[in-house]
């Protein structure tokens, strides 16, 4: 039962990764490294669908890297379809932000550290710091 629920959450995370990657591509060409990050996000989402657990960390990092590209267009951009696409992309990024604790565990495992509570907490704090920087970077 618990394993089925976890598989269901990973499916939603992979689906949101594919959707946010697809939606970010029309917005991304005028921004910094947007297409590259969207491509990495799409590949990681497909890897997660194939059962690769490390892809959770890559999806979360890629979605955090898409934030500086997308949120200014959603909040500060001109109206019309580009703004709606940016808002839909931000909505699709939400499951990745909510998966940060699982990404912290996956990152701790990828680096070869023991998955102690302290290491996972520090990794989670680092992911949160990256998220804050990603939100503030366009304002600098």
Each PLM stretch: what is its role?
Residues 1-140:
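Topology signature of small-to-medium multi-pass alpha-helical membrane proteins
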